[in-house]
Structure formats: structure tokens, C-alpha cells
Amino acid sequence: RDPARDLNPFVLYTTRPIRSGEQDGREYFFVDEKRLSELREAGKIIEERMYSTVQGPWYYFTADDGQIDLAKHDYLGIGTLESYLKLKAYFGEQAMVPLYVEVDDGLRLSRALERERKQTEPKYAEMCRRFLADCEDFTEEKIAEAGIVRRFSNNSTPEDCFSEIQNFVEQQKKL
């Protein structure tokens, strides 16, 4: 969170196991399928995706849990093209500015492998599945269909990329 820029994290939910170095409520809210069912029954699910992983089904979802107050703050979140389109439908196009962060495939795979090696029990098959699924989910055609035109390169440092994003968001707020 950067108070000077009023850019707050928008944290999604997942049923996947927490990885080494992650913190509940920072990268994701880590919940079980029972909690997901409760949120479904309460009508709180904005969007939901299920991935058939090597370890079984994992759900990623966005819930209307009160963390978003568009009248007071701007938010930065991570998601797929599918989740972006559903969030845009829920909050309204005027509330959403897509920021597409792209990374060279070789670098993305290298970073994923480095991250996976640090896990207590690395799951390389799942890492490969995720990489290939992302290649399918983020084709140029699908990016264009989602109406995303602005891209940010994350081929150098994450700090450089985030600084570029912050500057872009500031310019958008002035429009």
C-alpha cells in the first residue's frame, strides 16, 4: 500500500495450499472449499475459476467481502483475462483500468522454476501445467478481445514495473 498514491491491494481468494513465503491476506486469502461454499451460498462470489491441477481442483475467486470501497480508494489486483472481464461487468467499465504485465516466456519460466525450487516440496509438474495454461489463457487474440491495449514490461525488476504502473495510474486519475 502506498498512502501517497492511494493505491491499495485487492486480494483474491484461493483454495490452493499456501506456499513457502506466502502470507494469508497478502498474496491471497487462503480458504478451504467449505468457506468457498459459504460465500457462494451468501451470494458473495463475483467471479470464480477452477483449475484441475496435479494435486486436484484448486479454486481462485473474487468475493464481495467489503474490502473494496471505490469511493475512497483505488486498487491494484492480479487476475486472468476471464476474471478481469467479470470484475468489469460487476464494478462497471468506468471503475476498471486493465494493466497487462508481460514477461518474456523464457524469463517467466525461469522465475517460476526458481520460485518452485524454494518450496519445501516442489511441484514441478504443476508449475509446467500453469505455464502452459497461461500461454493458452493469454494469447494475443484473447488480450485484444478483452480490450487491453496498455502493457507493462516486467523483464527487468519488479520495482521498475510497479513504478511505471503507479505513474500510469496517476495519469489516469487526472483524466
Set out the residue ranges of the language-model regions.
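Switch/connector loops and helix/strand junctions flanking conserved nucleotide-binding motifs
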Residues: 19-20, 85-87, 106-112, 160-163
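Hydrophobic/aromatic beta-strand patches that form the interior of the parallel beta-sheet core
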Residues: 10, 29, 97-99, 150-152
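Small-molecule kinase domains that catalyze NTP-dependent phosphoryl transfer to phosphate-bearing small molecules
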Residues: 117-172
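Conserved catalytic network of the ASCE P-loop NTPase/AAA+ motor domain
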Residues: 21, 66-71, 89-94, 142-144
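Short beta-strand-centered segment that lines the nucleotide-binding/catalytic pocket of NTP-utilizing
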Residues: 2-19
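ATP-dependent small-molecule kinase phosphotransfer cores
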Residues: 14-75, 79-81
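Short glycine-/polar-rich loops that comprise or flank the Walker A/P-loop
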Residues: 5-7, 92-97, 145-149
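Conserved phosphate-donor/acceptor-positioning beta-strand/loop module used by diverse small-molecule
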Residues: 74-80, 91-116
